[in-house]
Amino acid sequence: GTPYYRVGDQVLVLATPMVRRRDSLFVPLQFLTEVLPQRFVQRYHYDGRRAHFTEIAGTGSVQHAGTLPNGLLPGHVVTIDPGHGGSAPGNPGKFFPKGIMEKHVTLQIGLLVRDELESRGVAVRMTRITDVRAPLLERAPMCSDECDLFVSLHVDALPSTRHNYRSISGFHTIIIGEESSADANRVARMENESLRYEIEDGPAAAADALAFILKDLSRNEYFLESASAAHLIQTHLAKIHSGENLGVRQHNRLAVLNTAQRPAVLVEMGYATNRQDAQLMQSRSGQRKIAGALADAIVQYLIEYDHKVGAGALSGAGR
């Protein structure tokens, strides 16, 4: 059996494999409770509280009482994490203006994402709103029970020793998972660099901290939701980004995600070592485009989640 299935040109994954026995195909319960209600919103509905699946008569769309004008149920909370900050500047930004580094760009875009989401009825928590170093291991836990999604914003950069490093552009989103690649390992080493500013009590404390953050969370119950949010982010960024859509990647040793208690993604918005990417990320017009695309993706994710859990379930925080 295989856990993969195709919707249009997208290949998606189920929690467990499908099984074929003679002339019958057995699919995970998740296909009934999540996939059908999400992909065929007007036809199927699943009430998570009552564990009740229904097929909707007719072709009219399901209307939820109390929805916002954009179709979102009220009460959602999202945590935005502008990567790095303070004494942890991130990458220096080869093609950013002099004095501008990753920590500045992530904060500028993060604040714009906050404004976009709040204007659409989503409450936002920020891990930082000024140029300060928020402890890496305390960022994701800010999105706990009363939060729907954690989004960490970052800027990628390639080493000058890599062939044609300036010509490589694009964006990708990382979630916790097993399918680590050499490039994902490179990103993890770069983004985990902030830890060296935080482990100050000697080798023993460092070993304990690293053992905690490097633990295998591939069984994270929020893997599928994180993957859904990540794919939507890639889809919406592709509409405004001139670089290559590098897709959704997995890694199980990325500190800021390994401490997540809710669905969580890390977005590499472009390469500071590419002139076009850098211009998009540091210009005010480019930042607004990125922020708008991220907000579009987040709102779509929340709306789809509302449909999956059902109109009878409580909306927003604390689900």
Language-model regions, residue ranges each:
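Soluble non-cytosolic domains of exported or imported proteins
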Residues: R22-V27, F96, I100-Q108, R133-L137, ...
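Primary recognition of N-terminal secretory signal peptides and signal-anchoring hydrophobic helices
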Residues: G1-T79
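Sec-exported extracytoplasmic/periplasmic mature domains
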Residues: T33, P37-V41, L111-V122, S144-D148, ...
